[in-house]
């Protein structure tokens, strides 16, 4: 009797179980990998590119070993206004550097920084900022530098959002990074920022290991401590300026393959996108336009937006994007939410 009662149940399970197994993948496929993006041309372009380069029957199929995507950092992956995060770090290190080198106290631009005049600091020239960076990012071992940056990031907060800088990553771009990796792409940060600085937190914040960070790089010197242990000291010598034409040069030097997709947000990314999209088969170039003063900042001067020295997006760059088929991402229209903590 027991066996007879069980047979109908077993028969039912034999029918239902295959249906369940069939529907589970279907539900998974229907999950939106880019939920923080509004439906629109930018989101569709990402899906189309990934589909064309990863489906084996596609004429534009790219083997996994060749799948490279590069991402600028400042203004593309996280907030860059009102001042680049690394520059803020360097400015806050000036008093300590001057303490060790008192002769810098009355010398510009260190004198201006010590005075704490924000308006005057904002007007510092690129040459003056480079002098500050050279003084504050050298003269210590690589290990000491990494420890210093970690310590600073643990307490430093953005003046507007009152949150750690590492929390101010753009959720839509974090989703793109994960989506690309889920489809066999190796993701790289290619930044004008300091390579050693970004490598400290890139794996934790972006899921990108330090060896996949290409940035502006300074020299190091090999030596030994008093116990004979070898170490590297950071020196004020520029090896690679990873801005403008330096980006494709850095990509060739450090990666060795032309990317199939590149993301940026400013004139400093133009050559990287040119280099990427000049290749054969499907290519994707995307630029983030900061046009959302309510949730973040609005700056260009493309499309009549306010001009800026930080993350400049000119009308000429906008015109080139349209000419070359690059997709301009409107922060205001294309991103449903900006940060992971947004409701």
Predicted regions and their residues:
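N-terminal carbohydrate-binding/catalytic regions of secreted carbohydrate-active enzymes
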Residues: 49-54, 58-68, 81-82
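Bacterial N-terminal signal peptides that target proteins for export
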Residues: 2-15
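Asp-based phosphoryl-transfer active-site loop
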Residues: 67-81, 273
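Short regulatory "switch" loops immediately downstream of catalytic or recognition motifs
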Residues: 1-2, 52-55, 276
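A metal-dependent, Asp-based hydrolase signature
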Residues: 83, 88-167, 171
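C-terminal cap/substrate-recognition subdomain and adjoining C-terminal extension
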Residues: 29-37, 41-47, 51, 66, ...
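Bacterial N-terminal signal peptides
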Residues: 12-26
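Short, solvent-exposed loop/turn and secondary-structure capping segments
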Residues: 80-83, 88-91, 200-201, 275
């Amino acid at each position: 009797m027991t066996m007879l009662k069980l047979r109908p149940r077993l028969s039912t399970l034999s029918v239902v179980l295959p249906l369940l197994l069939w529907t589970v993948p279907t539900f998974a496929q229907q999950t939106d990998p880019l939920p923080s993006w509004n439906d629109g041309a930018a989101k569709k372009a990402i899906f189309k590119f990934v589909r064309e380069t990863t489906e084996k029957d596609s004429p534009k199929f790219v083997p996994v070993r060749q799948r490279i995507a590069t991402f600028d950092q400042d203004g593309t992956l996280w907030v860059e206004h009102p001042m680049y995060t690394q520059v803020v770090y360097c400015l806050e290190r000036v008093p300590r550097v001057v303490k060790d080198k008192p002769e810098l106290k009355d010398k510009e631009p260190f004198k201006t920084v010590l005075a704490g005049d924000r308006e005057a600091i904002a007007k510092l020239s690129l040459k003056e900022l480079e002098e500050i960076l050279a003084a504050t990012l050298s003269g210590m071992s690589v290990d000491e530098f990494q420890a210093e940056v970690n310590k600073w990031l643990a307490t430093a907060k953005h003046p507007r959002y009152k949150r750690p800088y590492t929390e101010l990553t753009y959720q839509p771009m974090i989703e793109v990074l994960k989506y690309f990796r889920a489809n066999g792409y190796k993701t790289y940060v290619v930044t004008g920022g300091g390579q050693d600085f970004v490598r400290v937190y890139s794996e934790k914040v972006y899921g990108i290991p330090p060896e996949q960070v290409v940035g502006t790089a300074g020299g190091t010197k090999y030596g030994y401590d008093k116990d004979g242990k070898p170490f590297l000291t950071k020196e004020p010598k520029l090896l690679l300026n990873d801005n403008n034409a330096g980006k494709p040069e850095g990509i060739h030097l450090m990666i060795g393959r032309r990317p199939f997709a590149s993301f940026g947000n400013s004139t400093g990314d133009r050559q990287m996108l040119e280099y990427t999209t000049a290749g054969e088969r499907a290519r994707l170039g995307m630029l983030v336009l900061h046009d959302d003063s309510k949730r973040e900042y609005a700056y260009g001067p493309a499309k009549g937006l306010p001009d800026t020295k930080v993350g400049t997006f000119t009308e000429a760059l906008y015109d080139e994007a349209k000419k070359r088929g690059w997709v301009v991402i409107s922060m205001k229209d294309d991103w449903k939410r900006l940060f992971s903590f947004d409701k």
